[in-house]
Amino acid sequence: MVKPLWVLAVALAGAGVVGAEGPGTGRNTPHEALKAYAAMDYTLAGKLARQIPDTPEGQLVAGLCDLYDRSRQDIGRGQLTLAELFYNEKMPLDYRLEAGVALARTAQLMKERRELYGDAGDRYDHEKIFRKVMAMAPGSSAARNAFLYLIRERLEDPAQQEAAFEELETFLRDFSGDPKLLPPIHLLAEYEYIRLKNDYKTAARHLQEGYEIGFANPSENRSGLFRLAFLYHKKIGDKPLAVKYYKEYLERYPYSGQAAVAQRFLEELGEGGK
């Protein structure tokens, strides 16, 4: 199964979102359990989590390790642990969000692989959980992740596609959090508008918005910029924007493998790369 967004564990630990240690636990055990999980040292993380079973950190890390540690995987137990944490309003919100996304995502994946899991994934309504996460913290990275997993699924269903595209646009328009969280949604939109609608203009708009915000991966910035120029050139026929982005590509990535292609396309457009 796909591993959870373990980077959040680092943020949680670094932010000091850890509970008080009980008798007999190590001084920094909650922090260390989160740190070990973030480093994907599941053996150590699980060991530390078992020392603090009554803390939010212990429950979160134990549940996640049960899901993702293949050496001692117990999906049913992990899902139950995370469900108890997610629905407990006394728990820290960040932990509930992480638990909810992991719980819903594993249930979703199990339903997609019924030949392996049968009806075990039906125990949890992943769409309901994803939407609850989105409602609990609308501008958070957890809400973004929940939406991304959910909208991909809806776009795969022909009966839901039109409504899904509307929901996608609404989510992006109304998102109240950090815009830097949105480029993955814009990339998905670019792909799906081309795949399902042959709508290159809307696809280019999403790619442009994602590029202007900035992609987390530098290689995605590079490939996205070239793709943007290519879409305006070959698919949309907008010469000014094609020229603009080809020139920007050559300025930023003059030694890349696609630089010669960008130069040739500029010459094709009568610009000569100048």
Residue ranges and their predicted role:
Residues 17-72, 76, 94-98:
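N-terminal leader/linker segments that initiate helical-solenoid repeat arrays
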Residues 31, 61, 65, 98, ...:
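"A position-specific structural signal for the A-helix of alpha-solenoid helical repeats
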Residues 37, 67, 104, 108-115, ...:
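Specific register positions within alpha-helical solenoid repeats of the TPR/Sel1-like families, i.e.
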Residues 49, 79-82, 130, 168, ...:
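Hydrophobic/aromatic packing residues within the alpha-helices of TPR/SEL1-like helical repeat arrays
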Residues 51-58, 86-99, 132-144, 172-183, ...:
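Short solvent-exposed coil/turn linkers within tandem alpha-helical repeat scaffolds
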Residues 83-87, 121, 125, 208, ...:
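TPR/TPR-like (Sel1-like) alpha-helical repeat modules
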Residues 152-156, 173-225:
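Alpha-helical adaptor scaffolds
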